[in-house]
Amino acid sequence: MKRDKRLEIIKEIVTNNKISTQEELQSLLLERGVEVTQATLSRDIRKLNIIKKRDKGESFYSFLTSGNSKINSDLQLYFYNFVISAKSVGALVVIRTKLGEADVLANALDDERDSRTDILGTIAGADTLLVICASEKAANILTAEIKYILLG
């Protein structure tokens, strides 16, 4: 089966079912005649921007939605998976991350500077990232975008 067709089937399954595990998704794919390895399924999940959401003690797969965010989908996944909190202070944004992930996020944000003139630079520690923005307004917008992503 071609990849595009498989991706369409995965979209349909995730949209219409509460899937908790990759094994469950793999089983539903098999019921539809789609045999896929766990590694391929993981790549497909990443490609489709599918994330695990938590609600009332349950976790299930859902699509990452960006709204009007200027943050690209790869960076959204980094934010969703690694960020604990974000707060703006003047033209700065202080982002708390999981331990060891601040520098990964800083590199990803630095890569965005060509397309985002509102981000001037970053400084990362082990679990804290400081983003220097062009203005207080830019810092507030970036913080709002991050918080929107974290809410899922």
Curated annotation (Swiss-Prot):
From what superkingdom does this record's organism come? Bacteria
- Chief site of localization: cytoplasm
From the Swiss-Prot or TrEMBL record, state where the protein is found.
Cytoplasm
**What Gene Ontology terms for biological process does this UniProt record contain?**
L-arginine biosynthetic process; protein complex oligomerization; regulation of arginine biosynthetic process
InterPro entries xref list: Arg_repress, Arg_repress_C, Arg_repress_C_sf, Arg_repress_DNA-bd, WH-like_DNA-bd_sf, WH_DNA-bd_sf
Q: Does the keyword Isomerase apply?
A: no
One Pfam family here? Arg_repressor
State which pathway it belongs to.
Amino-acid biosynthesis; L-arginine biosynthesis [regulation]
Matching Gene3D superfamilies, A to Z?
3.30.1360.40, Winged helix-like DNA-binding domain superfamily/Winged helix DNA-binding domain (1.10.10.10)
Q: Which GO terms describe its cellular component?
A: cytoplasm
The protein's UniProt keywords, in alphabetical order, are: Amino-acid biosynthesis, Arginine biosynthesis, Cytoplasm, DNA-binding, Repressor, Transcription, Transcription regulation
In Gene Ontology terms, what is one molecular function of this protein? DNA binding
Q: What does this protein do?
A: Regulates arginine biosynthesis genes.
The similarity annotation says: Belongs to the ArgR family.
The record's section on NCBIfam families has: argR_whole
Name-wise, this protein is: Arginine repressor
